């Protein structure tokens, strides 16, 4: 169970834990915040896979990406998944990241992400990503969230 906080108690209501999980399961883009060695923030939109049973968030990325370099200094990240269309709602939070380099494990996670986002592992983008994983060029970031801060302006006060 992850602690759920109301992000804007003055205006909107919070999503329940179940609503937050459903929302995270059905979205495709997450904004990932890391901090570089100079202490400067970096926010990147990424595709992700959310496992609602474990509350883990998985993100494929190149092993030499700025995200991975930043995580070598600081394993704590922030994230935001939101709907830019009214009624606005979303989930943001903070968590600790583990970096997975195991090809078989990474392929399994990537296939789940690709089936959800592209509908097929035969899609050209799917084939490219899975090929990069097989070459060992891609890693999987696993976020263990500490909390969710949620908002739902569709249920405004």
How would you name each of these model-derived features?
Residues 24-25, 72-73, 114, 134:
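Alpha-helix boundary recognition
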Residues 85:
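Short His-centered aromatic/hydrophobic patch
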């Amino acid at each position: 169970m992850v602690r759920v906080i109301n992000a804007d108690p003055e205006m909107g209501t919070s999503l329940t834990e179940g609503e937050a999980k459903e929302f995270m399961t059905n979205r495709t883009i997450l904004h990932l915040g890391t901090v570089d060695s100079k202490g400067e923030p970096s926010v990147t939109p990424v595709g992700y896979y959310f496992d609602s049973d474990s509350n883990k968030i998985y993100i494929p990325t190149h092993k030499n990406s700025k995200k991975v370099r930043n995580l070598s200094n600081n394993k704590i990240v922030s994230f935001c998944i939101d709907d830019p269309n009214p009624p606005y709602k979303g989930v943001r939070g903070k968590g600790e990241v583990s970096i997975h380099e195991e090809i078989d494990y990474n392929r399994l996670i990537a296939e789940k992400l690709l089936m959800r986002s592209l509908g097929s592992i035969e899609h050209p983008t799917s084939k490219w990503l899975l090929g990069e994983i097989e070459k060992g060029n891609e890693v999987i970031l696993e976020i263990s969230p500490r909390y969710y801060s949620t908002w739902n302006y569709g249920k405004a006060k």
